[in-house]
Amino acid sequence: MYNNARALKPVSERDALKKALYKIKARHNGELKSLKTAWVNFNDAFCDGLEWRTITVVGARPGTGKTLFMEQLVNDVIKMNPDQKFRVLKFQFEMLDETNGIRKLSMNVGSDYNTLMSKGKPIDKGIFQRCVQFYEDTASYDMVDVVYDPCTVEEMCATIHAYMLENKTDEGFTNTLVTIDHSALFKTGGKYKDKFDMLYGLGEALTEMKKKFPVAFLVLSQLNRNVETPERAKDGTYGNYILDSDLYGSDALLQHADVVLGINRPYNRKIKFYGPERYIINNPDLLVFHILKSRNGFMGMTFFKLDRVIMRIVEVDPPPTAS
């Protein structure tokens, strides 16, 4: 009967209320805080920043700056939350460790990749010394660890479990921000026949991990190619916007995520008037963040741009609209 399924033991809902009261009190007393970023509107999509035990999925097409977004976010939360004790565990499947290091140096010294790689002319000695100084400064806050080896979803879970135990203190598990770049690069096989099976398994695994440990997940994902069709690029139409259905394997991750963002770069798609509001697009570095899902915060869209002088993504006011 019931295929020998095990019976689950219900618990009183008062247990949940008790935990809620503890959390409310901890937030009030400042014992529990969100991770604030430099982006006010991004923080508003949450409860004053990234909350622990949440899953955030960020989808974008190649060339829109999603990896820079993630690297800047990690960089900023370390600088802007010095009163919080936490670690960062990055699953970086897409680039070599040295390339990851160059990108981090680029963002922190304000020089682009080609400058650091001496394209056209040798790198300025002052810039190189700033790179060296940044590396030496990281010794005082060595709190970021990276996994570069491709792995399965199960291996990711085992790695997180071991990492949490390794960094456990007498006070308990250490809060950990876990970043994944990107979701489709996990290896398939075993019980996962294809990428879509794997993404469903990933969503379930992330939910299991956030229930078990004080982690916050930031997951980068691709968007489907259909966002680049000529029909979607027609000026002044709703199809210009990123939709939750554009997320690769959308159903698999959407139902598990607490916050879902879609990043768009309208200029790349030759859109001159963005969406029904007809925002005027004349800046190739303008980014539009569509907040597609938010359990506890702001939904809608907000505007950013890549500031190439300082190699950072910065918030900007909405562009003017055409009549």
Give, region by region, the residue ranges found by the protein language model.
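The Walker A/P-loop phosphate-binding site
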Residues: 4-111
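C-terminal regions of RecA-like/P-loop NTPase motor modules
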Residues: 9-18, 110, 114-117, 136, ...
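Cytosolic-facing regulatory segments adjacent to core modules
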Residues: 22, 37, 43-45, 80-174, ...
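Hydrophobic/aromatic beta-strand patches that form the interior of the parallel beta-sheet core
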Residues: 56-58, 89-91, 145-147, 218, ...
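Alpha-helical scaffold elements adjacent to nucleotide-binding pockets in ATP/GTP-utilizing enzyme cores
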Residues: 73, 99-107, 159, 205, ...
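Helical hairpin unit composed of two closely spaced alpha helices linked by a short loop
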Residues: 89, 174-211, 216
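A short beta-strand-to-loop transition that corresponds to the Sensor-1 phosphate-sensing loop
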Residues: 92-95, 182, 215, 219-225, ...
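Flexible beta-alpha connector loops of hexameric P-loop NTPases
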Residues: 116-121, 145-149, 188-198, 231-243
